Amino acid sequence: MSEQEIGKDYELKVRRNPQSLLEEYPRKGNNIQSTHYCAGCGHGIIHKLIAECMDELGIQERCVMISPVGCSVYAYFYFNCGNFQTAHGRAPAVATGMSRAEDDAIVMSYQGDGDLASIGLNETLQAANRGEKMTVFFVNNTVYGMTGGQMAPTTLIGEKTVTCQTGRDPNYAGHPTHMCELINTLKAPVFIERVSLANPLKIRLAKFAIKQALTIQKEGKGYSFVEILSPCP
């Protein structure tokens, strides 16, 4: 389906929060009016897109989200479904165990680039190569966001971070890791897609990809991977 078709067919509606998001996520002190995410962060948008798809597919009661160390770990405050918090990079192993132990579960691994493409790279590729029944949502903001914006494996050439203040130099730090392209070299994955949150149309396309990935899970077809290019202010 083309971008034009997506934009044409998408009906804008004023909606309440999806049932797959918790009604309240209370915080304390000076943070009482805010979420855990910085202003301009893409995580909130992604949460709502995933939750809407869970509702529309009728899979909330079957869903289990794996949220490892990083900004991703806060997902358990917001999603109204099962959740496991894991050590940095270990989400694919935990997701594999959950998927194999509970065959009817819809297993989602929600990971950032500093987690999935760095300390968790080996486990990510091995789970994809085995074709494990899981859906991976890879939130790529090209930096280590939680710890202050250091260079990550996905940081682009010339992109400035606190640890490469003149921009990433491939002669010193190598080239960015492109996860979709890496996973596409494997035979087992069923669905691989890269989307972004750059504008309203791109957000609609992101939801379309998320729903496709979860549909594959619902139908028990195997491994799906959605990379979401997300801002980190």
What is the predicted function of each stretch?
Residues 42-45, 114-116, 230-233:
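Gly/Ser/Thr-rich loops at beta-strand to alpha-helix junctions
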Residues 38-39, 82-83, 111-113, 168, ...:
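A generic structural signal for short
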